[in-house]
Amino acid sequence: MAKSTSKTGRIAIIGASGYGGLQLVKLINEHPNFEISTLNGERSVGKNWNEINPFMKILQDKKITKSNIDEIALDSDYAILSLPNGLSSQLTPLLLKKGVKVLDLSADYRFKSLDKWKEVYTKEAAKYKRYDYELCEEAIYGFSEEFSSEISKSRLIACPGCYPTASLSLLIPFLKQGLIESEGIIVDAKSGTSGGGRNPNEQLLLSECSESISPYGVIGHRHTAEIERIASHFAGHEVNLQFTPHLVPMVRGILSTVYARLRDPGLTAEDCKIVIEAFYKDQPFIDILPVGIYPATKWVKNTNKVMISVEVDKRNGRIVLMSVIDNLLKGQAGQAVQNLNIMHGLESDIGLPKITFYP
């Protein structure tokens, strides 16, 4: 890793009023190498941040402003976009043209093919006209543990989704080394309600989701295509898998369980644990649990950690991989700051929490 850049990085947070934006404000405000230069948010334009968020006062109070590309370019080195899908693509080309590096938390640049994005995000494609084919090709997928070299040289990072982060952290080591069959992979994931965002949503009302668990997006969830794209990249051929998300009555956290068939049925759980440990050696945010101990979302809450466990079912030759993340940190804002650290020439873990408050 390169030495720390002496200059403090100036960060514009665009879309600061959502849950992802709130996490970003906290992380950047407390970061030793970055400062908040601009806070944009359509909900509270003209109001001071500390006035509308008394529970999260920042060191240097900022007024919420509308996005003005020229003003952002004057006082920002980086812009982190925490915006709805489609909207980021309307600002990103303008920011890049002004020399501002962009980290995008939406799905707008997660596909190398703009046509594929339009196929997956049909409603957004109808609403926002896009012709930025070259930027889709240029963008680096921000899975920090695997693409750090590319991230360090890039001006545009497509930060992964929360479900893909949890699921790909399990799949990549085994697909890249050809240790599992690429057919018949099942990804079963559970998420807390904050993954649905801060806007009103009947499904996320307390009386609707409390004391209940339910699947959604069973066939064709948008993250399926994202997981398959990156899985195919590491497998070296097309991967078609089954992904089913579930909503559980908690605020934050994701549990992802992956089922796949081992190419070598003689591999044990200990063997597979060694594979993961070797693959993620020296990665500060990946924790591998002993065989027989299974991860809980509470163990990573309010951290940027991924906690992984593995089992092998000898009866059918299947591997069972489990991971937990905090969907708002490692699954969103924390991973963005991890990528920002890499872009700025810092160690990837600076300014990011590693230990939960427990219980």
From Swiss-Prot:
UniProt catalytic activity: N-acetyl-L-glutamate 5-semialdehyde + phosphate + NADP(+) = N-acetyl-L-glutamyl 5-phosphate + NADPH + H(+)
Keywords attached to this entry: Amino-acid biosynthesis, Arginine biosynthesis, Cytoplasm, NADP, Oxidoreductase
One MF term in the entry's GO annotations: N-acetyl-gamma-glutamyl-phosphate reductase activity
Annotated InterPro entries: AGPR_AS (IPR023013), AGPR_type-1 (IPR000706), NAD(P)-bd_dom_sf (IPR036291), NAGSA_dehydrogenase (IPR050085), Semialdehyde_DH_NAD-bd (IPR000534)
EC number: 1.2.1.38
Top-rank EC class of the record's enzyme: oxidoreductase
Residues forming the catalytic site: 162
Entry GO CC: cytoplasm
Segments passing through the bilayer: none
Subcellular location: Cytoplasm
Listed pathway(s): Amino-acid biosynthesis; L-arginine biosynthesis; N(2)-acetyl-L-ornithine from L-glutamate: step 3/4
Primary localization class, coarse: cytoplasm
GO terms under biological process: L-arginine biosynthetic process
One Pfam family here: Semialdhyde_dhC_1
Superkingdom classification of source: Bacteria
PANTHER family noted in UniProt: N-ACETYL-GAMMA-GLUTAMYL-PHOSPHATE REDUCTASE, CHLOROPLASTIC-RELATED (PTHR32338:SF10), N-ACETYL-GAMMA-GLUTAMYL-PHOSPHATE REDUCTASE, CHLOROPLASTIC-RELATED-RELATED (PTHR32338)
Family the entry assigns: Belongs to the NAGSA dehydrogenase family. Type 1 subfamily.
Protein role: Catalyzes the NADPH-dependent reduction of N-acetyl-5-glutamyl phosphate to yield N-acetyl-L-glutamate 5-semialdehyde.
This protein's name: N-acetyl-gamma-glutamyl-phosphate reductase
Gene: argC
